[in-house]
Regions:
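Short, charged recognition helix plus adjacent turn
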Residues: 1-22, 27, 31, 35, ...
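Recognition helix of helix-turn-helix/homeodomain-like DNA-binding domains
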Residues: 38-53
């Protein structure tokens, strides 16, 4: 997953992290994802908009909160040693 562009109802274009958006959609809200990760909602907003990087610990928490529908390797592909992509050849 990557960064995607979204146009809101006012016609404003903004970028969002597709993996974090999928996680929010999966659990129901930014607040619910924040609760699952033990952080405050503004942190989830910052992850969504690329203002803060999701820690390895929270990437795993997101994977667990979404019952694996948003795996940690999609959230932090740069940590392939920690979160290997099972669909990628070694």
């Amino acid at each position: 997953m990557a960064i995607i562009l979204i146009v809101n109802s006012a016609g404003v274009i903004f970028m969002v992290n597709e993996a974090i958006k999928a996680a929010i959609d999966s659990v129901g809200s930014q607040q619910k994802l924040a609760n699952a990760c033990g952080v405050k909602q503004p942190s989830v907003w910052a992850w969504l908009h690329g203002k803060k990087r999701v820690s390895a610990e929270n990437a795993k928490r997101i994977e667990m909160a979404t019952n694996g529908s948003v795996p940690a390797y999609l959230i932090r592909p740069d940590l392939s040693a920690l979160f290997p992509n099972p669909n990628k050849a070694a």
